[in-house]
Each structure stands twice: as C-alpha cells, then as structure tokens.
From Swiss-Prot:
UniProt remark on domains: ValRS has two distinct active sites: one for aminoacylation and one for editing. The misactivated threonine is translocated from the active site to the editing site. The C-terminal coiled-coil domain is crucial for aminoacylation activity.
Motif 'HIGH' region, residue numbers: 42-52
Subcellular location: Cytoplasm
The protein, known as: Valine--tRNA ligase
Gene: valS
Length: 951
C-alpha cells in the first residue's frame, strides 16, 4: 500500500468503477425485503451546499448499510425544476448579458432559454453528488419536468378537479409586486419594522353622533393609502363608545363613499382608537371581516403595486359589481404605493382630518426571493381543498404508520395539519407545469389532460377558440408527488410495487409543511394498496437540524460564511476562496467585512481533507438538535482518523502479507489480547448497529472512532508486539488471524460512513481472507456474535491497560524519559491482581518499559515511591536516583506561573462587559471551556508538587 493516504488519487476513479459495474442498482431479488429512499430533489441549476452534503451523507450511510444486509435497495435520485428560483436566475442572466427582460423574448422563447440554461448548468449538482460518493441509481434519474412526471402532474390535477378538490376562486393572496406572482405564506418573511400609526377622522353620515357628541369616528391605520379601497368601519359590539352606531354610516374622506359601521370582534377596544377601517381587497383580516358582513371588495392596486386609474369593484363573492363607483381621485392615479401613502396623508391633513401620527412597531411581510414588501391582492387563483386531504394524513402519524425521528416534530406537523388552510397552487410564472385548464371566449373553464381531450369531452368544435390558462403550478405541487411519480405512476409499474411505500424520508425541519405534509396528503389520496387502503409515502421521516457556521450563524451568501463541501474535500487557496465569497455579490458593500473575516478564519485557505473525512464529520454532527454548528477542528480530526486507519492497515499488512494467517487450517493459539479485541469488536458491532437502526449517526460515528483509534490502533496493535517479536508458530498464526479478521470486519463496519478508504484497503485485505468478491459494497454487514465476547479477557485486559496507563502517567508527571526502564513494585495485591501480573509479565514489561516487576510481601511498605492505585493493588515506582527534587520543583513552579497567567487573561476577558455583550455565545462558551481546562491543569501540577516535596 502507498505510504500515505491520498484521497485525491483514489476517490474519483473508485466511484467511476462502482458506477460502471452497476453496484448502485437494486439487486432485483424480490424475495428480499426492499429498502428505498427518495432523495429530496435539489434545484436542477443549483450547486451542492452543506445542507445537501449533510443529508446525502446520512442517506448514503443508510443505503449502504441496508444494501450490505442483502436488501433490494433503491436510492432514487432526481432534480427539481424549482420554478421561481430558476426563472429568477435566467431573468437576471439575460438582463445582465443582453439587457433584455423575459417579455422581450416572449413565453416560448424564454422557456427555451431556461431549457438551454438547464442543459448548461444542470449537470453541476449531479457531478458534485458523485464526488460525495452517493450510491444512487443514476439510470433512474428523474427531473420534475420530465415527460413522465409532467403526465403524473396533469393526471393528479384533473382527478382532483373532477372530485371537486381543486377549484378556482377570487381570493386574497400574498402578491409579490416585483416578481408579479402569488407566493405562499411559507415564502413570506416577516420583518420587524419601525413605522407610524395615522389617526384619521371619518365624518359620520346623516347627522349621527358618538356617545361623547362628536360627529366623526377616529380610525387608526398603518396603511393610509388603502383608504381608497375601504368599504366599512368595524367597532367592537361590546364597546360602549360606539355600539349604538352599528348599522349607521360614515363618509369616506377623499372619495366621499358612504360605507357602513359594522360590529365585529376583530375591532379591539384596547387597541388604537377602537375603530378599524375595513379594506377587504387589501388586508387578510379585513377580507374575513368583509365576508362576515357581506361587504363589497374594492381593488385599488395594479399587479406592480401602483394605484390603478380606476378601481375594480366586486361583491363579497368576487363577482364584478356596480354597488360603488370605480372612480379614484386623479391626483392618486398611477402613483407607486408608498408615494400614494404620502399623498393620501397630505390630502387628509389638508382637509383637517388628520388627528395625530404616533410611532408604531409593526411586522412587515417581505417576499423571501423578490425582497420587496408583499401586498395582499385579490386575484383569481387555483386552490386545493386541503382539509379533506389532511384528515387521513393526520391519522397516519397518529396511528404510527408514519413515525417522525426525533419524535418532537410530530407536534409541529399536527399543529399545522389540524388548522390547515386551502393551498393556493397557481403561480404567475412561465417556468413550470402549465395549468391544464382552457377557457372559451365566454370565460367558461374546461379542465383536461390536453386540449384534444377537452374538445372531445365537451363536444367543442374547431370553431370554438380555446386559450390555455397562463399560470403554472406551485413547484411544491409536483414535488408532493415525488415518491410515486418517480416510480412510474399513473402506470402500475414493477418499481411502484417493489419500492412503495418507501422506507425513510430525510429532510430538514424547515420544509415539513412545504413538502413532507403535502407528500403525505397527495400520496395517501392517490396510492392505494391491493385492499384499497391508502398507502403512506414513507414509514419514517428523519428530520435533520440545520448546519450553521462555527458561531451558530446561518450560512448565507450575504454573511459570506458559506463553506462549499467540495472545498473541504479538494482544498482551496485563500485568493480563490475570497473570490468565491465576494465575487458577484448582490450587496457589494459587504465584501470588505467578508474578506476580513475569511482571512482571519482561513489564513492559508482550506486544506484538502478528502470525501471520507467530510462524511465522517457530517455523520458525527448528526445530533437530534435543531441547530448543528460546523466545526473545522472536527474535520481535521476525522482526516487524522483516516490517516490513522490507513497506517494501522499498513502495519497489519506488513505483518501478515506473505505469512500464514491461519485461514487454511493449522493450529492457532489466541493470546489474551486477541481474545480481548474480538470481544471488544463484537460489542462494538452490537452498539454500532443499534445506533444506525435508531438513526443516531452521531453515536455510531463516535463508537467507530473510539474502537478504531483507541482500542484497535492504540492498544491492540501495541499488544500484538510481544507475540510478533517472539511468539510460537501457533501464537503467531492466532495473532495474524485476529489482526486480519478484525481489520476486515472493521472495514465492512465503517464502509457505510467512509466508503472510499474502506474499499481501497479492503481490496488488499480480502486476499488474505480468501475472499474473491469484487467489492466491499456488496459484502455482508458484520453481525454480533455473543460467543466471541470473552468476559474474562475483557476484565483482565482492562486491568493491564489501567496498570500500563498508570506507569505512563507517572513518567509524564515526573518528567522521566519514555525510554528509561523502570522498576515496578506492587503493594497490597489481591489474588486476581497477582494472577494478572504473573500471566502477563511479557505484555506489562514491553508496553510499560519495565526492567522488573516485584509483588511486595504483605508487611513490606517498600521504598520512597510515587504511587498510583489500580483495581486490587497499589503501584509503586521507586524514585531514588530518577529525579533531582529541587530541579523538578522549580520546573513545576514555572509551569504553574505560566498557567496562572493564562487564567487571569481569560478571567479579565470574561469580566469585560463589552466583550461579553458583543461576542457570539459560541465564542464565550469556548473561553469558559479554556478556563476550566487551565484550572484542571493547575490542580494537577499542585498535586505533583506535593508528591515531590514529600519524597
């Protein structure tokens, strides 16, 4: 084997070999249980980020683990067309490169442009997924706009429409005036903002007066510009100030519209003035109030968010109406909405109707992609009746057909599902699945799979002109069908029968509503088993936390703290990293701050660590928490782990290749160390499998690390040296056999998490075991064997390790050279301790570098010594002639002074209020941790001073 482990040389050729050999495909053995994971489809034109790498590492670990258990495994791969995101990228691109908008191109040509862009950049993410070692079946790769998936989308839409579960209605939606489309509640980002509350007088009509004799009501509003669309004023029916006015009218300022005063709980007596203006077409709460009191709806805004030239007037049901005039005063027409706000306030003030303006804290909705203030807008949209679909989806989780891991996410799911609103599925975009609905000139709507079907079903001749609905479906509509559309539905395919319901869905908790809930609803409605019972899309939902940076901040381009997973695999120079983080920024003014931060964090760029080290780190971080802080130190630690495994394997091979390892018969004697490592390894298998079976990848990674590094490399390889240097033929055969057996099993155990290094080493080790199979990927996963757990060997070895560590600690504390042989005395020995010493003198003398071992008689106290206690004995190392007492005390005093300096430096830092207020929580925690470490070190040194002073 090469002297050093070089991931760059092995990873890509190995992956290409695996893919070419077809190892990622299902084994097709239908007598075996199937295991299937559907990858959450990433955006087709995107690139891999840490969240993808994290979730895909977990999925690949599960798939490889189940594949090695002989299951018929499918990891279904694919990408998402990501409507709004992809359209925005291409719109930006043509604006930057050609100075054009999509309207300059027209719909067909612009969509062609997007397909071109997909062809150009659509391969990036799949290339990157290969680099991660993902063992997905590439031959089954799907895209949400593939013909097959598009047919499934049409099929679902048509069936839901025929069942009256999809309808078209004029409703209030979140409108993004920049992107000119409806967006869902989940895509709205609410930001805290400092604003104003305007108090405006609305004159009472017909000589009415308030309880205290005023001829006007004072209405408090944060949105004076929408006054032009008011159709009522609400007061609380219990409010003594106004309840006698319910049913009377006010005259709306500026427009002179006569509008009613209604009694409604929405008006809060304690808030503002207790009178609320009602604009059903421009506010979600007002829309509901308007419905309850049959108020008309007046839309005063264009889709760009400007004031219209004439208003649209509708009755409560959304039909056009002439109950009110559609006139808008000329001075406000065509004004942008925030300019209109100023103009309305000025006009009201000029009439003497502006009573006061108060500062007011409010929450303002922004579109998370367009970045502008969202406008509630009255539009015709398509909706899914969600309550009908939600009922079975709630029951599936209640009765355990679907389980959430961690379980607490079930409550999050229930709270949303039990109060679910109808789902607005239409989007005013061009890129996506076009809604399969057609209109004739009279405005009648026809829904069908295509225009021919519509004409046939409705007997429409060629003379009837039809135009297709311009809108496309919400991206999440097609994603909701992902588990079954990818397997060939609506055809009843073999794949659907074999792999549905799927086994596990891995997802971030941030898309539990967007995606998880909707998959459950859609799947249970459309997929039934042979008895007609609704099928769930998956049995388990494993929710991951979100990967944040080392300070707990969300990774984002604007913060400049994004780490590309492949930069940790391949390494990246500082100039390249700076270019990546500060080039093409949406907010160039942040570049300087980002540059400084990056230079501080990565002064030499990022070193290459290889894919396995990245995967191991991600698995080790997969705790059950919501937030997972990335840690470069751990990545370095797991790269060191890979090096350690490589070097240990070289040691094993150097001692076994070309030797008799006992795989072809011959007498074998197992040493205590051999019996111990086999017992440890089997206990490791058991605990590791339990961790993987319960989705505790962090615990599994910890178990693997602890066994490999501490037990196998640090102890067992050392413990084999006495046999290797002077054992009998049978002992040598036994130890070689154990070395190879444990290493080969360990490689299979570790393979799901670190596939590349394990396959590479295994190819060398398999020859020694007489294995002829081609790949570790299809080898059986290690099984726990209770007969290999030798309790006596475990107990005896544990004791020997304690004794060896005790002697090593005395050396370190007393500053004695590691190579100097020592004399060891044992005092107050139990029978067990004496037996252990006598049976294992060779081990003890070699590993603790001892020149002699003497068990003292019961009454002998022994000479002046440094002592350590182990189970059933006291270990003594006589100090005569080993150290110079004065020099040693002086050295320790110097050490103590140095540590005290560090302690006071950190204490001053933590006492500085400015530092504590400014520094991130993670930084403060790190300082406290350092302080604890120094305090412990100081206590140890003082203890040593006392021991030496007493000599």
């Amino acid at each position: 084997m090469e002297k050093t482990y070089n991931p760059q040389d092995i990873e890509q050729p190995l992956y290409e070999h695996w893919e070419k050999q077809g190892y990622f495909k299902p084994n097709g053995d239908e007598s075996q249980e199937s295991f299937c994971i559907m990858i959450p489809p990433p955006n087709v034109t995107g690139s891999l980020h840490m969240g993808h790498a994290f979730q895909q590492t977990i999925m690949d670990t599960m798939i490889r683990y189940q594949r090695m258990q002989g299951k018929n495994t499918l990891w279904q791969v694919g990408t998402d067309h990501a409507g709004i995101a992809t359209q925005m990228v291409v719109e930006r691109k043509i604006a930057a490169e050609e100075g054009k908008t999509r309207h300059d191109y027209g719909r067909e040509a612009f969509i062609d442009k997007i397909w071109e862009w997909k062809a150009e950049s659509g391969g990036t993410i799949t290339r990157q997924m290969r680099r991660l070692g993902n063992s997905v079946d590439w031959e089954r790769e799907r895209f949400t706009m593939d013909e097959g998936l598009s047919n499934a989308v049409k099929e679902v839409f048509v069936r839901l429409y025929k069942e009256d579960l999809i309808y078209r209605g004029k409703r209030l939606v979140n409108w993004d005036p920049k992107l000119r489309t409806a967006i869902s509640d989940l895509e709205v980002e609410n930001r805290e903002s400092k604003g104003s509350m305007w108090h405006i007088r609305y004159p009472l009509a017909d000589g009415a007066k308030t309880a205290d004799g005023k001829d006007y009501l004072v209405v408090a509003t944060t949105r004076p510009e929408t006054l032009l669309g008011d159709t009522g004023v609400a007061v609380n029916p219990e409010d003594p100030r106004y309840k006698d006015l319910i049913g009377k009218y006010v005259i709306l300022p500026l427009v002179n519209r006569r509008i009613p005063i209604v009694g409604d709980e929405h008006a809060d007596m304690e808030k503002g003035t207790g009178c609320v203006k009602i604009t059903p077409a421009h506010d979600f709460n007002d829309y509901e109030v308007g419905k309850r009191h049959a108020l008309p709806m007046i839309n005063i805004l264009t889709f760009d968010g400007d004031i219209r030239e004439s208003a649209q007037v509708f009755d409560t049901k959304g039909n056009e109406s002439d109950i009110y005039s559609s006139e808008i005063p000329a001075e406000f027409q065509k004004l942008e909405r925030f300019a209109a706000r100023k103009a309305v306030v000025a006009a009201v003030d000029a009439l003497g109707l502006l009573e006061e303006i108060k500062p007011h804290d409010l929450t303002v909705p922004y579109g998370d992609r367009g970045g502008v203030v969202i406008e509630p807008m009255l539009t015709d949209q398509w909706y899914v009746r969600a309550d009908v679909l939600a009922k079975p989806a709630v029951e599936a989780v209640e009765n355990g057909d679907i389980q959430f891991v961690p379980k607490q996410y079930e409550n999050m799911y229930f709270s949303w599902m039990r109060d679910i609103q109808d789902w607005c599925i239409s989007r005013q975009l061009w890129w996506g699945h076009r809604i399969p609905a057609w209109y004739d000139e009279a405005g009648n709507v026809y829904v069908g799979r295509n225009e021919d079907e519509v004409r046939k079903e409705n007997n429409l001749g060629a003379d009837v002109a039809l135009r297709q609905d311009e809108d496309v479906l919400d991206t999440w509509f097609s994603s909701a069908l992902w588990t079954f559309s990818t397997l060939g539905w609506p055809e009843n395919t073999d794949a659907l029968r074999q792999f549905h319901p799927t086994s596990v869905m891995v997802s971030g908790f941030d898309i539990i509503f967007f995606w998880i809930a909707r998959m459950i609803m859609m799947t249970m409605h459309f997929i039934k088993d042979e008895n007609g019972k609704p099928q769930v899309p998956f049995h388990t939902v494993y929710m991951t936390g979100l990967i944040r940076d080392d300070e707990g901040q969300k990774m984002s381009k604007s913060k400049g703290n994004v780490i590309d997973p492949l930069d940790m695999v391949d390494g990246i120079s500082l100039p390249e990293l700076l270019e990546k983080r500060t080039g093409n920024m949406m907010q160039p003014q942040l570049a300087d701050k980002i540059r400084k931060r990056t230079e501080k964090q990565f002064p030499n760029g990022i070193e290459p660590h290889g894919t396995d080290a990245l995967r191991f780190t991600l698995a080790a971080l997969a705790s059950t928490g919501r937030d997972i802080n990335w840690d470069m130190k751990r990545l370095e630690g797991y790269r060191n782990f890979c090096n350690k495994l490589w070097n240990a394997s070289r040691f094993v091979l150097m001692n076994t290749e070309g030797q008799d390892c006992g795989f072809n018969g011959g007498e074998m004697t197992l040493s205590l160390a051999d019996r111990w490592i086999l017992a440890e390894f089997n206990q490791t298998i058991k605990a590791y499998r339990e961790a993987l079976d319960s989705f505790r990848f962090d615990i599994a990674a910890g178990i693997l690390y602890e066994f490999t590094w501490n037990q196998f490399c640090d102890w067992y390889l050392e413990l084999t040296k006495p046999v290797m240097n002077g054992g009998t033929e049978a002992e040598l055969r036994g130890t070689r056999h154990t070395l190879v057996t444990v290493l080969e099993g360990l490689l299979r155990l570790a393979h799901p998490i670190i596939p590349f290094i394990t396959e590479t080493i295994w190819q060398r080790v398999k020859v020694l075991c007489g294995i002829t199979a081609d790949t570790i990927m299809l080898q059986p996963f290690p099984q726990y064997d209770a007969s290999q757990v030798d309790e006596a060997a475990l107990a005896d070895t544990e004791w020997l390790k304690q004794a060896i560590v005790a002697v090593r600690n005395i050396r370190a504390e007393m500053n004695i050279a590691p190579g100097k042989p020592l004399e060891l005395l044992l005092r107050g020995c139990s029978a067990d301790a004496e037996r252990r010493v006598n049976e294992n003198r060779g081990f003890l003398q070699t590993l603790a570098r001892l020149e002699s071992i003497t068990v003292l008689p019961a009454d002998d106290k022994g000479p002046v010594s440094v002592t350590k206690i182990v189970d059933g004995a006291e270990l003594l190392i006589p100090m005569a002639g080993l150290i110079n007492k004065e020099d040693e005390l002086a050295r320790l005093a110097k050490e103590v002074a140095k540590i005290e300096g560090e302690i006071s430096r950190i204490e001053n830092k933590l006492a500085n209020e400015g530092f504590v207020a400014r520094a991130p929580e993670a930084v403060i925690a790190k300082e406290r941790e350092k302080l604890e470490g120094y305090a412990e070190a100081k206590a140890k040194l003082i203890e040593q001073q006392a021991v030496i002073a007493a000599l």
